[in-house]
Amino acid sequence: ASQGLLLMIPNMYKIAGELLPCVFHVSARTVSTHALNIFGDHSDVMACRQTGFAMLCEGNVQEVMDLSPVAHLAALEGKVPFINFFDGFRTSHEIQKIELIDEAALTAMLDRDALKAFRARALNPEHPVTRGTAQNPDIYFQTREAANKFYEAVPDMVAETMARISEITGRSYKPFVYYGDPEAEHIIVAMGSVTETIKETVDYLRAKGEKVGVITVHLYRPFAVKYLMEVLPASVKRICVLDRTKEPGANGDPLYLDVVEAFATAKSLPCGQMPLIIGGRYGLSSKDTTPAQMLAVFENLKLNEPKNQFTVGITDDVTFRSLPVGEEISLAKPGTFEALFFGLGADGTVGANKNSIKIIGGTTNKYCQAYFSY
C-alpha cells in the first residue's frame, strides 16, 4: 500500500498487458505528499487505475470475506489482474464478527478449465514460447487494442460471480448496489467504508420522510455504465459523488469524473434527463467520517446552488471549500451497546479491549465490532 504499491506500477503494466491473472489485496492508504503519512484513504489505488488492473472495492470486513473470492475467480476466468482494495485501518484493522464462506462451496465455483489454461501458460521446455518481445510502431498499436475484448467481458463475469456468491451467503452483491428510498431524489455515490455511515444516515433521513439513497461502488474498474444505470432510481434529481483522494489540478476527483462521464455517454438515463452532479472529498488520512458529516452532504444537495468540489470533515479557512457540519449524532440501532475507551501508550487498554471483544464474539451470539485509533 501507499508508496510501496506505487513501486509496483511498472510491473503492473506488464502483468496486465500480458493478461496474467493475479490479485493484489490492498488496504488502501495515503500516499505521502507534503508530510509523511501512513493512514488510510484511496490515494494509492487511484494512482494505479490506469495500469490495466481491474479494481474491486469492499466497505466492511464481511464484504472483504465475501468479495475477495470474486476477484480471484474473475481474474482467472477473464485473464485480467485485479486490485481488491478496502480502506486501510478503518476496515483492515477492524475487529468484526463475520460469517465465513464454506471452503468447499468456493472450491466448487473454481473454473477448472481456466485454471488448467493458466497453468499451461507457464514456461516449459516441452512447449517453448517467446515472451517479453519488443514491438515496433507498425504493430504495437494494433496488439495493444486487442486486449479490449477481455476488459469488455469483465463486468459481466464479475456480476455473474457475485450472483453465485450471493446465493451461497444470502447477502446480495452486484457491481453497483443501491440502498435507500426506491423513489429517491437525492443520492450519494461512494465506495469503501464510508458507505456504511451513509446507509445509517439514509435510514435516519428516510424516517423523517426524506427521499434519499446511496449507491455503493464495488466494481470500479472496468467502470460499467450499464450496471450503474440498472440500480439508479428513475426519480433521482441530484447526485453527490464522494472521493477519498485528492487529485490537484484536475476538474474533479476520479470517481466524480467517472460518474459524470457515465451520465454524459449513457444511451438512455433511467431518470429521463441529466441530473445535477456534484463532487466532494472526505476522509483523507483516516480522518473520521461521521453521520453528521453525511447529513451536511445531503443538506448541501438541497441548496439552490450546491457547493461543488467541496470538502467535509475539516474547516477549510484558506480556500473555503468545506461544508458546515452540525452537532454529532448517534445512529446506533436500538439494543446496541456502545463504549469509548481512552488509554495511554503501552498501558494495556488496546490489548484488553481486543481480548474482550474476541471473547464476547466467540462465546455469545452477539454481533461485535471494535476499532482502535492510535
Segments predicted by a language model, with ranges:
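Conserved thiamine diphosphate
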Residues: I38-G88, R112, E261-A264, S268-G283
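N-terminal alpha/beta PP-like core and its mobile active-site loop of ThDP/TPP-dependent enzymes
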Residues: Q3-L56, N84-F85, A105-T107
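Short acidic, glycine/serine/threonine-rich loops at helix termini
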Residues: L7-M12, T33-F39, D66-P69, H93-L100, ...
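Conformationally flexible catalytic loops at phosphate/diphosphate-handling active centers
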Residues: F82-V177
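Peripheral docking tails and interdomain loops at the edges
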Residues: R238-A332
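Anionic-ligand anchoring segments at beta-strand to alpha-helix junctions in alpha/beta enzyme folds, i.e.
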Residues: I168, P182, V189-H218, G335-Y374
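Glycine-/acidic-rich phosphate or pyrophosphate-binding loops and their flanking alpha/beta elements
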Residues: A163-H186, S322-T336
